């Protein structure tokens, strides 16, 4: 099923709520860029957002240990290591695994203009079936203008963190809230409940 209710294209299985997803392991970021700090920033931001959406925290160091044990490499260099979802589920006792790909993280400098582009893809897979439960992809382009290259570089670096935050907020807005969600929901108002 494809949906755009949250404003961004995403796919979600129709029976997501019935799947009973509570525990989500956040796999190390598949980083297609050369910046390891970007991958860390992205993963930390997603980790916090999942918690505030009502999914309990599974410490990243425990997840990283499992990737190190099973792949033989650290989580920062686990680019080619794709553990089966079932293996992660067995080791960690989770319901689903979220995979994240940092597709693009760059700034192009053209005279007095410097566009900064950040692109991310997220995919949530079920441990029980191995199928995709939810996925979304989002890009942000932030444009900067200035007369000196130094100031353009500074503006570009200052825009990365807000871009990551926007991407995470937008993509995860289409993921249903978890069972421990603390978000306030106003009561439904209907004409017949007023009387």
Which residues fall in each region the model found?
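C-terminal/domain-edge helix-coil "capping" segments
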Residues: 4-22, 88-91, 115-117, 125-195
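Solvent-exposed coil/turn segments that connect beta secondary-structure elements
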Residues: 29-31, 55, 63, 102-105, ...
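N-terminal segment of the mature soluble domain
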Residues: 33-99, 135, 166, 170-175
């Amino acid at each position: 099923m494809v949906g755009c209710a949250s404003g961004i294209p995403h796919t979600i299985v129709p029976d997501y709520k019935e799947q009973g997803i509570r525990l989500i392991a956040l796999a190390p970021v598949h980083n297609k860029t050369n910046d390891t700090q970007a991958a860390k920033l992205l993963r930390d931001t997603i980790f916090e957002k999942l918690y505030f959406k009502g999914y309990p925290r599974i410490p990243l160091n425990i997840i990283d240990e499992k990737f190190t044990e099973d792949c033989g490499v650290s989580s920062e260099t686990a680019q080619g290591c794709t553990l089966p979802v079932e293996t992660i589920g067995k080791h960690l006792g989770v319901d689903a695994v979220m995979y994240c790909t940092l597709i693009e993280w760059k700034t192009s400098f053209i005279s007095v203009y410097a566009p900064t582009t950040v692109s991310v893809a997220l995919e949530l897979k079920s441990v029980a079936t191995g199928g995709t439960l939810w996925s979304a992809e989002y890009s942000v382009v932030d444009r900067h203008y200035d007369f000196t290259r130094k100031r353009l570089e500074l503006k570009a670096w200052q825009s990365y963190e807000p871009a990551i935050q926007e991407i995470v907020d937008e993509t995860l807005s289409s993921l249903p809230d978890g069972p421990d969600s603390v978000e306030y929901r106003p009561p439904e108002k209907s004409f017949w409940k007023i009387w």
